[in-house]
Regions:
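Bacterial N-terminal signal peptides that target proteins for export
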Residues: 1-7
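Bacterial N-terminal signal peptides
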Residues: 8-16
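Sequence signature of WD/YWTD-type beta-propeller architectures
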Residues: 18-192
Length: 192
């Protein structure tokens, strides 16, 4: 009898563990922009929701309420409307409500910092894992928008390796090109 009770208890525990797992309502959102602080001049934080057709994003701030819509799984905020919202809500916390169909609903916050971000960043554009290094570009991106500008392309220099090193605090920056036509460009305070 004692063994039978133990078997029933174990069976009950096993069956209880077979229930469906609760799903995270934001498992399909990419990138995850939930509960963050953003600079007051940052480019729109566009995002995707997997398998969503129509998406509604309602943003509530102290100075207003803003409505955005997404289609085919993509929320792409209009740049002017986005920047107007950030200017109006600088220093405030925004509540963001996202709805996609009946199964995808949740809220999160964005705190709009009073500090702005530096407008430009530069980076070396290369295939992942450095496996195809022959196609290297040095680009500059305006982080308040999505505009990019090509600064260098190794296809114009016999496919030589390009290293771009920029420093913060407006110090000396340099770009180095390896190979038979290699060289280095030094920049200090905007002067080459």
């Amino acid at each position: 009898m004692k063994h039978r009770n133990i078997i029933y208890l174990l069976l009950a525990l096993v069956l209880a563990g077979c229930s469906s797992r609760p799903q995270d309502t934001f498992q399909g959102m990419f990138p995850d922009y939930t509960d963050i602080t953003i600079p007051c001049n940052i480019a729109p934080l566009n995002f995707r929701i997997a398998n969503a057709s129509a998406i509604t994003v309602q943003v509530k701030g102290i100075n207003g309420e803003y409505l955005f819509r997404g289609h085919r799984g993509l929320v792409k905020f209009p740049v002017r409307k986005w920047h107007r919202m950030l200017r109006t809500e600088t220093g405030n916390t925004l509540t963001v409500n996202v709805t996609a169909g009946e199964n995808y609903r949740d809220s999160f916050t964005w705190t709009v910092a009073q500090d702005s971000i530096d407008k430009y960043m530069s980076y070396r554009l290369i295939e992942p894992a450095y496996e195809v290094w022959s196609g290297i570009q040095i680009e500059q991106r305006d982080v308040t928008s999505f505009r990019t500008r090509l600064l260098g392309d190794n296809r114009n220099a016999e496919l030589c390796c390009m290293n771009c090193h920029t420093s913060n605090r407006n110090g000396t920056s340099f770009m180095h090109l390896r190979g038979s036509k290699g060289g280095t460009i030094l920049t200090r305070n905007g002067q080459n």
